[in-house]
Curated annotation (Swiss-Prot):
This is S-adenosylmethionine:tRNA ribosyltransferase-isomerase. It comes from the Bacteria. It comes from Anaeromyxobacter dehalogenans (strain 2CP-C). It holds the Pfam family Queuosine_synth. Gene3D superfamilies: QueA-like.
Length: 345
């Protein structure tokens, strides 16, 4: 299977540079079961498109100010992106991406406006293992001072005060992500209330978003691509909600590709098992979806693991045709863009 089969032309002007207000004012393309044409709705219409007994599954990870700009002991400039907490939550040990004018060496101490990081290991390809000089609430405060919101590079502006709130879901709880689970950015409290009144239930899992989600695929052979691991957790309460939804015949509606990957990774012996884990699952066409019946997702980059996942879920030809229609109709793409609802039943 070739990466070049997952390409499409996207005018630069359709890449959303800022969020809409309110959050649920974004557009929603709907791909229902069968071969019919996509429907074009607003995201605020979501309660009408789901049924009583369905279960929405959110990713409750919280984006941290993970981009750090500082100096090495020599005075040279260095940039670090905290990608994966190795101890869970805001611990001291992290996997990070780094760049500097000269190589970053093992044992180096990097300073970021009062926060220090010691390089414990050089993994190669720009990845490092580092130990920070604080953890927990002290680390959260230090990142608030020294860190920046890690907006994706296709947002061609500096982060501002609005991004601190808008590049975060309203239910974000567990700090640790270097990117937002963007399908969740469309939800508002009034929309959640309307979904609940409709009889749609909700629960949350946690996957800390890192390079496994946002790094590009190198080369054209999909079978040769290896995902970077990302840590996830399914609570016993979430596992029970998922089992109950199955028992009553409700659909499992994953909000975002990270929720899809969490649920599919945690599938054991006919159910989603509770507990922590680390996933390197690369979902591509041919994957046997077991845990998910529907998904909400944004419009993704050409030639990305995220687009490949959506094609696996909704059918490659149908999804790519829908993307071409989205371009023709002026849908907004990527993190701050519009959304798609894909239903398998």
């Amino acid at each position: 299977m070739r990466l070049s089969d997952f390409d499409f032309a996207l005018p630069e002007g359709l890449v959303a540079q800022a969020p809409v207000t309110p959050r649920d004012a974004s557009r929603l393309m709907v791909l229902a079961p069968g071969e019919g044409a996509p429907a074009h709705r607003g995201f605020a219409d979501l309660p009408e498109l789901l049924a009583p007994g369905d279960l929405l599954v959110f990713n409750d990870t919280r984006v941290i100010p993970a981009r750090l700009l500082g100096h090495k002991a020599s005075g040279g400039k260095v940039e670090l992106l905290l990608c994966e907490p190795l101890e869970g939550g805001l611990g001291r040990r992290w996997r990070a991406m780094g760049q500097a004018s000269k190589p970053i060496r093992e044992g180096a101490v990097l300073a970021f406006d009062g926060l220090e990081a010691r390089v414990d290991a050089v993994e190669g390809e720009g990845f490092y293992r580092v130990t920070l000089d604080r953890q927990g609430a002290e680390l959260e405060a230090a990142l608030g001072r020294a860190g920046r919101i890690p907006l994706p590079p296709y947002i061609r502006r500096a982060p501002d005060a609005e991004d601190a709130a808008r590049y975060q879901t309203i239910w974000a709880r567990a700090p640790g992500s270097a990117a937002a689970p963007t399908a969740g950015l469309h939800f508002t409290e009034p929309l959640l209330a309307r979904l609940a009144a409709r009889g749609v239930r909700r629960t949350a899992v946690t996957l800390h978003v890192g390079p496994g989600t946002f790094l590009p695929i190198r080369g054209d052979d999909l079978d040769a691509h290896r995902m970077h691991g990302e840590r996830y957790e399914v609570s016993p309460a979430a596992a029970a909600e998922l089992a109950a939804a199955r028992a009553r015949g409700g659909r499992i509606v994953a909000v975002g590709t990270t929720s899809v990957r969490t649920l599919e990774s945690a599938w054991r012996d006919g159910e989603v098992a509770p507990g922590p884990g680390r996933t390197e699952l690369f979902i591509r066409p041919g994957h046997p979806f077991r845990a998910v019946d529907a998904m909400v997702t944004n419009f993704h980059l050409p030639r990305s693991t995220l687009l490949v996942l959506v094609c696996a879920f909704g059918g490659q030809g149908r999804v790519l045709a829908a993307y071409r229609e989205a371009v023709a109709r002026g849908y907004r793409f990527f993190s701050y863009g519009d959304a798609m609802l894909l239903l398998r039943r």
